[in-house]
Amino acid sequence: LVEHGFEPDGVKRIKKRTCEEHNPYGEDHVDRFAKIDDDIIADVTNRPEATIGTWVGCTTAYYQPEIFENLISVLNTAGITPKAMTEERCSGLPQYKLGLRETAFDLMEYNANIINDSNVDQLIVDSPECYRAFNEFYPHFGYELETKVIHSSHFLQELASSGSIGFDTELNQKIAYHDSYELSRHTTPTNRKDHETSDIHSAPRELIDNISGVERVELRHNREKAFSCGADLGVQEMYSDIGRDVARTVLNEIERAGAKKVVVGSPACKQHLSDVIRKDNLNFTVVSLPEIVAQANSALHQRSNRPS
């Protein structure tokens, strides 16, 4: 339909922003990393010898820089300083899902080239949408990556299991984990059979369970049956009221579970749930997995949330 000119106005706006600024939000591409701490950016750039790379992603770069900052800080405690893909653009999956195929393919080709030219052996990705794009859509459409793409929850849990990162601070909190639908419903073998899949249910939970004093509670709808929080780009652009109502459904589940803090494995989920919490004046805190790990490590200066 989009290719035949029947796209909604919201899709047209996203296409225009992407073509102009290489991200669906229309934020200035030249300022992609401007909100991230200067010292952090300096550490992860100009590292031709690095064999581990990291992908920032649009939402983190423009609205949730503390996620990336805490991820790098945690990795540093394990003796790892990854290389950032400083020329990155949107992964293309949001555009593909909206029918903007040619726009998506242009992004995929560009990103595949810069990732392959980086010569990294592993690429740590925090955004579930980017993770799914690189592992499923890129190879499906012929944009093969010459590196292993790993979600940050898996990488951090491997470090925790090996003792490379520690948890020496008791948080003494009841915490819920919300499964991002991209991780829990679209990368699991139970839902998709036509490509190699990866179940991202256990790693985030095991990571949280390593933290002393945390009582982790499950939401009623979890794992492959988890509810979306409504953060999808198309929903936000064209049906924002519905998106907020969907988020309230998830927040109601968190409240019924008895938690006031929720950990998410998705920058978009953190951004959207936090926005609804602020608008509704609710007493919840949303943090990412890298942030909760940093909170539990006294050697780190945990970077606080910032207003968007």
Task: List PLM regions with ranges.
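A polyampholytic, Gly/Pro-enriched intrinsically disordered region
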Residues: E102-E109, I165-S180, Q236-V246, R303-S308
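Immediate flanking context of iron-sulfur cluster ligation sites
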Residues: T77-E87, D117-S118, G213-A226, R248-K261
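Iron-sulfur-cluster electron-transfer modules
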Residues: L1-G142, L159
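Short, flexible loop segments at boundaries between secondary-structure elements
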Residues: E20-E21, Y143-L171, G213, H221-E224, ...
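Basic- and aromatic-lined ligand-binding clefts that recognize polyanionic substrates
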Residues: T51-W55, G163-V217
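Local cysteine-cluster metal-coordination motifs and their immediate loop/turn environment
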Residues: G57-A61, E87-L98, V125-A133, A176-R192, ...
